[in-house]
């Protein structure tokens, strides 16, 4: 810790904002890694099984299959089952709202990574400029000759500040890109699931058996 503090102290006035940015970045990276690990894609066999039950009109069995299960597609199917007494357009709207809510959960806090990846190099550059200004002020002192030690410290501060900014920005940008691709891929899969579910729902007349089962569910 002492060595880290020594490096930060050499980084000049922008070192502390950069340190705070690095803490936020690390926290978001850990949070999103855990989130995506816990919320993997749903069991395809379960989804197909439930879709077949809906297709056959056995909504009670489909509802029971989903109890205690988690995942974006499970929530979509639960939404469809809860709205089977509505017309197709209302079911589609309900599915789209559920899908959008799931996407928002996946996107949560990603903006923080985007901002940090953008501002960290700028903060590093600001530290570089301030360090160089400090060095020139010393060099142009009253005697005309500055203290070499102080000049070196100013240059070191400038270089360290730039390095810290890049060290923070590069991995942050990489993780932001990685998480964004996961969100895009899963959003596409959710849209496909909505289409598949609507195909199943529209393929049935949803007659008396559906109405009876929906009443039992509610």
Model-inferred region functions:
Residues 41-126, 130, 134-142, 177-218:
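Predominantly long cytosolic amphipathic alpha-helical stalk/bundle segments
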């Amino acid at each position: 810790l002492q060595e880290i503090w020594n490096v930060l102290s050499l980084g000049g006035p922008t070192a502390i904002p950069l340190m705070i940015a690095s803490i936020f970045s690390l926290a978001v990276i850990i949070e999103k890694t855990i989130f995506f690990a816990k919320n993997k894609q749903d069991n395809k066999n379960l989804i197909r099984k439930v879709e077949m039950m809906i297709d056959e009109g056995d909504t009670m069995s489909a509802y029971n299959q989903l109890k205690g299960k988690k995942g974006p597609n499970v929530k979509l199917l639960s939404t469809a089952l809860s709205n089977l007494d509505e017309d197709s357009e209302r079911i589609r709207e309900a599915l789209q709202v559920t899908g959008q809510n799931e996407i928002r959960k996946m996107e949560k806090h990603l903006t923080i990574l985007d901002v940090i990846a953008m501002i960290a190099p700028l903060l590093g550059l600001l530290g570089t400029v301030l360090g160089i200004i400090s060095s020139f002020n010393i060099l142009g002192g009253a005697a005309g000759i500055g203290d070499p030690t102080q000049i070196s410290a100013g240059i070191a501060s400038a270089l360290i500040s730039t390095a810290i900014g890049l060290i923070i920005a590069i991995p942050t940008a990489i993780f932001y890109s990685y998480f964004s691709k996961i969100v895009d891929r899963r959003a596409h899969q959710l849209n496909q699931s909505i289409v598949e579910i609507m195909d199943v729902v529209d393929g049935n007349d949803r007659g008396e058996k559906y109405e009876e089962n929906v009443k039992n569910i509610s």
